[in-house]
Amino acid sequence: MAISDMRRQYSKGSLSESDITSSPFSLFDQWLKDAIDAGIPDPTAMTVATVDSTGQPSQRIVLLKDVSDKGFVFFTNLGSRKAQELSVNPKVSCHFPWFFMERQVRVCGSVEKLSVSENAAYFFSRPKDSQLAAYASKQSKPIGSRALLLTQFKQLKDKFANKALPVPDFWGGFRIVPHQIEFWQGGEDRLHDRLEYNKAEDGRWSTQRLMP
C-alpha cells in the first residue's frame, strides 16, 4: 500500500498573535469548546507519553477530566504502566489531536497526584459499572481470556448490587502541571501556525511563534 502521496490541504483557519491570551488555559478552553461544539468524537481524549527508567517512552490515550489554571487532570489505576513510570519520572507530555478542526495542542510538564478527597469526588461521580470496572481490572496485568475478566466483573456486580463501593486505594488522579503548551493550526501549503507558551519561574507565561 502506497501512502507517501497521501496528504490534504489545510484550510479551516489560522492562528495569529491577536488570538494570544495572557494565559494558555484561556485559549485552550476556547479550543476545547470549539471541538465540543463541532461534535468531534471524544474531544477530551488526549495521548499521554511517559518514560520508564531505561528511557523507553510509551504512550496511551486517556480522557481529560478537568482543566484549570493548575493543569490537566486524568485518572488511572495506580498499578498501571503509566502510573508506575510517573512515580519514577514525573515528567510527562500530552497531546490533543483535533483533526477535524485541523488543530493540535501539545503540553509538556510534570505530574502531581490528586488528593484523597479529589479522587473520591470523581470516583463517586462515575456510573456504578465504571466503578466496578476499576475493581475488576488489574490494569496492564496479563489475563487468560476476556471471559475471565467478565466473570470477575459479574462477581463484583453481584457482591455490590445493593451497596456502595469504597474508593479503591489502587486508583487515583494525576494533574499535569505544564511549563510549555503549543497550539498548532493547520495552514495552506504546509505553512502551519504554531504558537508556543512557556512558563517562567515567576509563573508568568511568554509566547513565541514557531516555524512550521
Swiss-Prot record:
Biological pathway: Cofactor metabolism; pyridoxal 5'-phosphate salvage; pyridoxal 5'-phosphate from pyridoxamine 5'-phosphate: step 1/1; Cofactor metabolism; pyridoxal 5'-phosphate salvage; pyridoxal 5'-phosphate from pyridoxine 5'-phosphate: step 1/1
Pfam families referenced in this protein's UniProt entry, alphabetically: PNP_phzG_C, PNPOx_N
Recorded catalytic activity of this chain's protein: pyridoxamine 5'-phosphate + O2 + H2O = pyridoxal 5'-phosphate + H2O2 + NH4(+); pyridoxine 5'-phosphate + O2 = pyridoxal 5'-phosphate + H2O2
Top-rank taxon: Bacteria
Keyword check for Oxidoreductase: yes
Database matches in Gene3D superfamilies: Electron Transport, Fmn-binding Protein, Chain A
An annotated GO BP: pyridoxine biosynthetic process
Keywords: Flavoprotein, FMN, Oxidoreductase, Pyridoxine biosynthesis
Cofactor: how bound: Binds 1 FMN per subunit.
EC nos: 1.4.3.5
Residues where substrate binds: R7, R8, Q9, Y10, K65, Y122, R126, S130, R190, L191, H192
Cofactor(s) in the UniProt record: FMN
Keyword Transmembrane: no
Record: residues binding FMN: 60-65, 75-76, 81-82, 104, 139-140, 184, 194
A GO molecular-function annotation: FMN binding
General function of this protein: Catalyzes the oxidation of either pyridoxine 5'-phosphate (PNP) or pyridoxamine 5'-phosphate (PMP) into pyridoxal 5'-phosphate (PLP).
HAMAP family attached to this UniProt entry: PdxH
NCBIfam families from the UniProt entry: pdxH (TIGR00558), PRK05679.1 (NF004231)
Subunit structure: Homodimer.
UniProt xrefs under PANTHER family: PYRIDOXINE-5'-PHOSPHATE OXIDASE, PYRIDOXINE-5-PHOSPHATE OXIDASE
Family assignment from sequence similarity: Belongs to the pyridoxamine 5'-phosphate oxidase family.
UniProt name for this protein: Pyridoxine/pyridoxamine 5'-phosphate oxidase
Species lineage: Bacteria, Pseudomonadati, Pseudomonadota, Gammaproteobacteria, Alteromonadales
